[in-house]
Regions:
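Alpha/beta catalytic cores of group-transfer enzymes, especially the acyltransferase/condensing modules
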Residues: 1-106
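Acyltransferase/transacylase module recognition
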Residues: 73-164
Length: 164
């Protein structure tokens, strides 16, 4: 975090112990990568992404989203929803709206969000996506936690069979 502040970029994601993602202007990110390598950190690399997501550079998008969200009639959640912008359970429709708005520029507290679920007694997690990225993060957060990764029809069928 100190390095991010030093090179004027934002912490975009706190994914797992030892994995932090920064976001900002390209020059700042390049300086952060060089600084990470110079500080002896295990890895620092630039990611090929389309924007400076979860950073203050997304403020105008956040403002536009806030205007749109004012028009949305959110229902009260019927099951627990965790906001990963502050790693807590949202408390209602207005809280969901505010969390969605803050998500645009706020840091993703993935590790803390998963710890919250683990502390609540959840033992099995299901990930949908082309690669088991979140399963890898969970292994760093708490080794041995069961994660079922679903990436295609076959893995979906296997997951359904496991829970049947």
């Amino acid at each position: 975090r100190a390095l991010a502040k030093q090179v004027d970029v934002d912490v975009a994601n706190l994914n797992a112990p030892g994995q932090i993602v920064l976001s900002g202007f390209k020059e700042g990110i390049s300086a952060a990568v060089a600084g990470a390598k110079g500080a002896g950190l295990r890895m620092g690399k630039e990611l090929d992404v389309a924007g400076a997501y979860h950073s203050r550079l997304m403020r105008s998008a956040q403002d536009k989203l806030a205007e749109v969200l004012k028009e949305v009639d959110f229902a009260e959640p019927v099951f627990p929803v965790i906001s990963n912008v502050d790693a807590r359970q949202v408390e209602g429709a207005d809280d969901i709206r505010q969390s969605l708005e803050r998500q645009v520029t706020g840091s993703v507290l993935w590790s803390q969000s998963m710890e919250l679920l683990l502390e609540a007694g959840h033992e099995t997690f299901i990930e949908f996506g082309p690669k088991p990225v979140l399963a890898g993060l969970m292994n760093r957060i708490r080794k041995g936690t069961k994660v079922i990764s679903i990436s295609d029809a076959d893995s979906l069928k296997a997951a359904v069979a496991e829970f049947s």
